[in-house]
């Protein structure tokens, strides 16, 4: 193929405005099917994303961030989707897996704690990206589509990020 599926501008990498103009040109020339912002350190923020989304000919299709910065401020999700930008989250399991409430929900559904988190993300419109070197873990990660979290269980999971 002679194009990339998704080309991301790494936030904090120099002059964002001029770099974004270059990405728009590459998109218009058909060299990138989609363009977006990669904000792994959480330093770009939704305010800057809003400026680009509102002031550009080509809006970002994706806002990619890491789980720690995103999940600690879940309100970001609404701000991003207000601009029709897909959130892509690099999910890295952490301390939340030790939470007793998550263990109870996990047991209720017969799923792992990570599967409960991933299912919650998907139910909230987030494109979750996970990493694994093991076949078993990869299969576990994709086994999240055969169930849906009940509203009260989803609310319990959301509380993990608020604390």
What are these model-predicted stretches?
Residues 1-3:
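An active-site-proximal structural segment forming one wall of the substrate-binding cleft
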Residues 5, 9-163:
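Beta/alpha (TIM)-barrel catalytic core signal, keyed to glycine-rich beta->alpha loops juxtaposed to Asp/Glu
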